[in-house]
Amino acid sequence: KYIGTVNTKDTNKQELSNMMVGRPVQLQVNKDEAHPGDVVLSVKGFTVPSHLHKKDAVHNVSFDVRAGEIVCIAGIDGNGQTELVYGLTGLDKPSSGTITLCGKDISHASIRHRGEHMSHIPEDRHKHGLVLDFTLEQNMVLQRFNEPRFENHGFINNKAVRDYANYLIDKFDVRSG
């Protein structure tokens, strides 16, 4: 969709942001000073091999995340962000390093166990975050389908799924279409 063309000298950050998003964007956010808590995630000497090259996709990375912090992994495509996330979440196997979550070593924990305390928002939600043939309700319980409240004698409890989906839709102002 074409939005517009402007000369660099005739525009500013605000106008460009508004054009990119399609509505007025607030560029200044007033917020209280951060008071990060204790370290909840500690990654040390983390290496994930590349499936495409001989060189590691992620090599000897170390960092800490404190309670109250939100971490975003960003970079140019092909620089190892995806492999880092896959290694942390258990979708890929690192060749070395440790992951400590809430004081417990989860370096060899299952994906399900890691998911109890960590969340991942995929870069491409259509490719990795959703089952496009499923309904919105079904997608909302993908990671929870095994919970007793969504099961009824071996079958999906559709009413419970619908109620939970409606709860999430209201809580997070989810819009589909």
Place the predicted regions along the sequence by residue.
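Glycine-rich phosphate-binding loops of nucleotide-dependent enzymes
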Residues: 1-177
